[in-house]
């Protein structure tokens, strides 16, 4: 639903990365995939930023939390 704004800028619709690549199971051991959904500080990015569906966002969130407990991903990334 790209809308015309006053400045002539059209907002591009975000695509669900998981659905687009037909990923059925989000594995907590796949840190490369999970790092797409984490900010530089280590926080889980919201749906409005990543464009994932609600169902896939829940899968990603549980996988990230499992990976954090297993020490595959950091809880907080302090620089």
UniProtKB/Swiss-Prot annotation:
GO terms, biological process: translation
Family to which this protein belongs: Belongs to the bacterial ribosomal protein bS18 family.
A Gene Ontology cellular-component term: cytosolic small ribosomal subunit
Protein name according to UniProt: Small ribosomal subunit protein bS18
Functional note: Binds as a heterodimer with protein bS6 to the central domain of the 16S rRNA, where it helps stabilize the platform of the 30S subunit.
Entries under HAMAP family matching the protein: Ribosomal_bS18 (MF_00270)
Assembly and oligomerization: Part of the 30S ribosomal subunit. Forms a tight heterodimer with protein bS6.
Keywords linked to the UniProt accession: Ribonucleoprotein, Ribosomal protein, RNA-binding, rRNA-binding
One protein family per Pfam: Ribosomal_S18
Species whose genome carries this gene: Streptococcus suis (strain 05ZYH33)
Molecular functions per Gene Ontology: small ribosomal subunit rRNA binding; structural constituent of ribosome
Annotated S-S bridges: none
InterPro entries in the cross-refs: Ribosomal_bS18 (IPR001648), Ribosomal_bS18_CS (IPR018275), Ribosomal_bS18_sf (IPR036870)
């Amino acid at each position: 639903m790209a809308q015309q704004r006053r400045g002539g800028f059209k907002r591009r619709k975000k695509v669900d990365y998981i659905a687009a690549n037909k990923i059925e199971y989000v594995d907590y051991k796949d840190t490369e995939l999970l790092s797409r959904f984490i900010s530089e500080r280590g926080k889980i990015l919201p749906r409005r930023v990543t464009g994932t569906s609600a169902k896939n966002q829940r899968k990603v969130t549980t996988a990230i939390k499992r990976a954090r407990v297993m020490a595959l991903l950091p809880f907080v990334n302090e620089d």
